[in-house]
């Protein structure tokens, strides 16, 4: 059964002054480059070499041996957006 119509998944990443996590819903979540220590220390080429894992539930950056999940991103966004209010 294909659940991609009802499940929010990551489609791709876009890099500029922040990391934009583009979702299959059309929404974008933005992350700072200091989201994790490994991401903070990585250069742009290392970050652009990523692959989606878990059918879009996570991201693997092989050059820096880092995995991040959509659930973790959502928890981060929720806590940091609440702090900014």
What are these regions, as identified by a protein language model?
Residues 1-85:
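Motif-centric detector for short Cys/His coordination patterns
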């Amino acid at each position: 059964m294909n659940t991609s119509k009802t499940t929010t998944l990551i489609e791709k990443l876009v890099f500029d002054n922040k990391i934009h996590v583009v979702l299959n819903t059309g929404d974008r979540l933005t992350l700072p480059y200091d989201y994790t220590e490994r991401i903070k220390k990585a250069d742009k080429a290392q970050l652009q070499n990523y692959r989606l894992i878990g059918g879009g539930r996570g991201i693997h950056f092989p050059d820096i041996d880092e995995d991040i999940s959509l659930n973790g991103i959502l928890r981060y966004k929720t806590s940091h957006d609440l702090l900014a209010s």
